[in-house]
């Protein structure tokens, strides 16, 4: 986010966080039908690059790039960027089954289409587990059948809920679905096979057993006699004398 005046590091972090939250909310509202699943902001000295991750990148770009240009103009006007200092790019989600936002949006549209709650939830669970996830949890709450609200939880596989591994390995998303009987809350949590960060981390309960080193062959023990320097010199002279005698013969 560009600023003409210098601010402290603390205020800079807060301003960047607010900017990212507002930008993410804006894209969530504008690109919900295109399968929006997150964005990444890269700031360079000359311009700011915003990478939009979605399942349908062609719809994000639009015909001849019209939609992406409209979004660029809206972002530039909303966040007061200077002219030609912000660019938007569309990136396709590599694995939809391991993206909680994409699966949450998929479940949302299934419920809007009138699909049964259990069938929609189990379809998401099956798709996520087939994609290679360690575990998945789907929670749907609201007026599901009767007039009284309740919550239904569907889970499969392995799921952790606390500690630093929950931050590194859990991808979660929450959406709201407006139906005729009221608003439903949808939450999807996915236990990833690898951490979200690029650092190689493992769960604390995983024990890695290293292969044993190859044993060196045991040699026969021997004794080393340390002789004094004078005795060693005399022994050396005797050996030389014996060699000279042998040569003379």
Curated annotation (Swiss-Prot):
Looking at the keywords, is Nuclease present? Answer: no
Q: Does the keyword Lipoprotein apply?
A: no
GO molecular function of the protein, one example? structural constituent of ribosome
Primary localisation category: cytoplasm
Localization terms from the record: Cytoplasm
Disulfide-bonded cysteine pairs: these are none
CC per GO annotation: cytosol; cytosolic small ribosomal subunit; nucleus
According to the entry, every stretch annotated as the KH type-2 domain falls at: 23-94
Q: Which UniProt keywords apply?
A: Cytoplasm, Phosphoprotein, Ribonucleoprotein, Ribosomal protein, RNA-binding
Q: What PROSITE patterns would the database entry show?
A: KH_TYPE_2, RIBOSOMAL_S3
Q: What Pfam families does the record point to?
A: KH_2, Ribosomal_S3_C
What is this protein for, i.e. what is its function?
A: Component of the ribosome, a large ribonucleoprotein complex responsible for the synthesis of proteins in the cell. The small ribosomal subunit (SSU) binds messenger RNAs (mRNAs) and translates the encoded message by selecting cognate aminoacyl-transfer RNA (tRNA) molecules. The large subunit (LSU) contains the ribosomal catalytic site termed the peptidyl transferase center (PTC), which catalyzes the formation of peptide bonds, thereby polymerizing the amino acids delivered by tRNAs into a polypeptide chain.
- Could you give the subunit structure recorded for this chain? Component of the small ribosomal subunit (SSU). Mature yeast ribosomes consist of a small (40S) and a large (60S) subunit. The 40S small subunit contains 1 molecule of ribosomal RNA (18S rRNA) and at least 33 different proteins. The large 60S subunit contains 3 rRNA molecules (25S, 5.8S and 5S rRNA) and at least 46 different proteins.
**Similarity comment: family membership:** Belongs to the universal ribosomal protein uS3 family.
**Protein name per the record:** Small ribosomal subunit protein uS3
Q: Which organism is it from?
A: Schizosaccharomyces pombe (strain 972 / ATCC 24843) (Fission yeast)
């Amino acid at each position: 986010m560009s600023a003409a005046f210098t601010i402290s590091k603390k205020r800079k972090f807060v301003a960047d966080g607010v900017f990212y939250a507002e930008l993410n909310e804006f894209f969530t509202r504008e690109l919900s039908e295109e399968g929006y699943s997150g964005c990444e902001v890269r700031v360079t000295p000359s311009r700011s690059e915003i990478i939009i991750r979605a399942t349908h990148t062609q719809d994000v770009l639009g015909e001849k790039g019209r939609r992406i240009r409209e979004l660029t103009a809206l972002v530039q006007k909303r966040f007061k960027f200077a002219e030609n200092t912000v660019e938007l790019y569309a990136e396709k989600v590599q694995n939809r089954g391991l993206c909680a936002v994409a699966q949450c949006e998929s479940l949302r549209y299934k419920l809007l289409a009138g699909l049964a709650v259990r069938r929609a939830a189990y379809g998401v669970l099956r798709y996520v587990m087939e994609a290679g996830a360690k575990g998945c949890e789907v929670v749907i709450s609201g007026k599901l059948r009767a007039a009284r609200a309740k919550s239904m939880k569907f889970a499969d596989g392995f799921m952790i809920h606390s500690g630093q591994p929950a931050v590194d390995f859990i991808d979660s998303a929450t959406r709201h679905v407006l139906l005729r009987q009221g608003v439903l809350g949808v939450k999807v949590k996915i236990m990833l096979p690898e951490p979200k960060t690029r650092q190689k981390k493992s769960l604390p309960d995983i024990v890695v057993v290293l292969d044993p080193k190859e044993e060196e062959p045991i040699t026969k023990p021997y004794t080393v006699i340390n002789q004094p320097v004078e005795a060693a010199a005399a022994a050396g002279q005797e050996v030389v004398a014996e060699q000279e005698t042998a040569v003379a013969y």
